[in-house]
Amino acid sequence: MRIEYDDVELRAEILNFIMRKGRWGEHYFPIDTMANWLGQVVKNNGKNIRKKVKDLAKEGFLILHKVNTTVSLNPRLKREIEEYIQRNLKDR
């Protein structure tokens, strides 16, 4: 079942997905794989997911690796990331 998220909820869902995988610092995850997995749950398409990943990287929540093909969470902002997820991700 696909759910339609607004921009803030989608960003929180991306952060939550990467956090559940335990990808902090140099332990990174491929963006394409993440877009495919989230595409099964999120009604928004993969391009929107990739756009939100770039936005989160500009804000410092995410670190891009390997010529922007992989991503991990910024360990320096761990508390802010956890608060952002709790504040913006609705229980579904």
Which sequence ranges carry the predicted segments?
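Short alpha-helical segments that sit at the start of domains
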Residues: 1-25
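Minor-groove-contacting beta-hairpin "wing" of winged helix-turn-helix DNA-binding domains
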Residues: 69-74
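A short, conserved structural fragment
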Residues: 57-67
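Short amphipathic alpha-helical interaction segments
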Residues: 41-58
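Short, amphipathic alpha-helical interaction segments positioned at domain boundaries
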Residues: 77-92
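Short acidic, hydrophobic short linear motifs in intrinsically disordered regions
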Residues: 24-39
